[in-house]
Structure formats: structure tokens, C-alpha cells
């Protein structure tokens, strides 16, 4: 089971679009996917027509008194389940703070292997909730758009991923950056080229074009690939999903030193989780 935090520090970068769209495209490839909506705004929950909740079960999952799997519910997208966002997440971030990291690890470790992928839609900040998601996940994906501000603003996100890897979760890897809402303008092409020049293979090969089908799909409460399956943007999303499948870090060459460090960290986490359960 691959666990992936979809993270950026700002709203409007295509984070929820990437989460919902990739989940649906992965399901078309036969991969059962769970979306964990960790954004208090609940955009992913609203997109799929379920809506965020004011119940506190997700908060309880971080406390260890409820299981994430028990909170999962089916969505309109076949093969895609979701744990709804909750207004209690704001309370969790304020009250639990550092304990959120341990809570996220414990919650993710408790998930059964019922899903092939778990995609965590992070809040549009680099606060405790986002850090907790990075602690609980094996991978991170950074969605962004081909605008100067998005391109220049990606560095703090990459630095946060590196910080969590160094201090808290040595198993964490950057799976890549997904560029969306790519228009036909020279500016968009230049920004994408600059991103590839700076970050090389960390940028996914396929990009997702700008299309009115995306907001239309959100209004309809459906993933783009279900709302407009033959649209060019749906083909883009499927291409990104296929590359995501290929970028499995557990099938890549593992540095022995990093592997030992990650194994030692997991042992410490297991002891901490056991002592607080």
C-alpha cells in the first residue's frame, strides 16, 4: 500500500484537483484508492458530493480512539473511498500540535491493506497537519501551476519535505511535482521548462492542461475522468496516474544507509505507538 501526501503551502495550486483526479484515474487502472481529506476546508469531500462533516471521528483517529478504516466511505467514483474532512481538524491542529505527528503515524499504520493507494489531501499551509501527513506517509507529491509565483514558491515545500525526512521520517521520499493548468501560452511553456531545468526528473513528464472540464466536473460532483472521459484533460490525468504507478519508491534502488536509518526510525515509532496505545 502506497501512502502519498499531496502537499503545497498555498491554495489554488491544484492540490485537490490532483488528489481527486489521480484517485479516480488510479481506480481505472485497477488500484483501489482511499482519499484522506486532511484539509479543514473539505474541498475534496465537497468535490465528490459528500461534503465535510462537523463530527469528530477524524480527530479521534489522531487521538488513537478510532480507526481510519472505520471512517472510510464509498464515493461516486468506483474504487475510490474517502475519509471526510472535519471541522474538528482545526481543533486538532491547535490542541495536539506535535502529538499530531505520532497520531498520524499511528493512524496510517493501523490501516488495513484494503487499498493500494492512500492519497492525503493536505491543508494549504505548512502547519502541524501538513507535517503530520508527511510523518505518516511514505511519499509526497507537490502539485503546482505554471505561474512564476508557484514555481518560485515550491522551494519552502521541498525544504519542509526534506526537514521531515531528516528529523522525523527517513522513509519519506519526494515522488515528484505535478504541473497542472498548463495553458498554451509562452509563459506557461517557459515556466515548465524552468522547472524541469531546476528540478530535473523530480518533475513528472506528463502535465495536465488547463480545461473548463475541471471546474465543471467539480460542480457535478464527479472526477474529471468520469465527467468527461474522452476529454484531452482526462487523458492528461491518466498519463500522470500511469507515471505515478511507475514511480514506486519501493521498486527503486535503495541506499543501504538510508534503509538502515529508516528501519531504526520505524522501530522507535513502533515502541512509541505501543507505549501510547
Per-region residue spans from a language model:
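P-loop NTP-binding core
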Residues: 1-277
Amino acid at each position: 500500500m502506497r501512502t502519498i501526501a499531496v502537499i503545497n503551502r498555498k491554495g489554488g495550486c491544484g492540490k485537490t484537483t490532483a488528489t481527486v483526479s489521480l484517485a479516480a484515474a488510479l481506480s481505472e487502472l485497477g488500484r483501489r484508492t482511499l482519499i484522506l481529506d486532511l484539509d479543514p476546508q473539505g474541498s475534496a469531500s465537497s468535490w465528490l458530493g459528500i461534503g465535510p462533516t462537523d463530527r469528530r471521528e477524524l480527530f479521534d483517529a489522531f487521538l488513537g480512539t478510532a480507526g481510519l478504516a472505520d471512517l472510510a466511505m464509498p464515493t461516486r467514483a468506483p474504487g475510490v473511498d474517502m475519509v471526510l474532512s472535519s471541522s474538528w481538524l482545526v481543533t486538532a491542529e491547535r490542541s495536539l500540535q506535535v502529538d499530531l505527528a505520532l497520531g498520524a503515524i499511528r493512524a496510517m499504520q493501523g490501516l488495513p491493506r484494503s487499498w493500494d493507494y492512500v492519497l492525503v489531501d493536505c491543508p494549504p499551509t505548512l502547519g502541524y497537519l501538513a507535517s503530520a501527513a508527511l510523518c505518516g506517509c511514505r511519499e509526497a507529491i507537490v502539485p503546482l501551476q505554471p505561474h512564476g509565483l508557484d514555481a518560485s514558491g515550491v522551494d519552502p515545500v521541498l525544504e519542509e519535505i526534506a526537514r521531515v525526512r531528516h528529523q522525523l521520517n527517513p522513509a519519506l521520499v519526494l515522488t515528484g511535482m505535478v504541473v497542472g493548468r498548463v495553458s498554451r501560452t509562452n509563459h506557461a511553456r517557459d515556466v515548465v521548462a524552468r522547472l524541469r531545468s531546476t528540478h530535473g526528473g523530480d518533475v513528472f513528464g506528463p502535465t495536465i492542461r488547463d480545461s473548463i472540464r475541471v471546474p465543471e466536473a467539480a460542480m457535478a460532483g464527479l472526477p474529471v475522468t468520469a465527467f468527461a472521459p474522452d476529454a484531452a484533460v482526462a487523458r492528461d490525468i491518466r498519463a500522470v496516474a500511469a507515471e505515478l504507478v511507475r514511480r514506486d519508491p519501493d521498486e527503486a534502488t535503495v541506499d543501504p544507509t538510508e534503509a538502515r536509518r529508516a528501519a531504526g526510525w520505524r522501530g522507535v515509532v513502533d515502541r512509541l505507538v505501543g507505549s501510547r496505545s
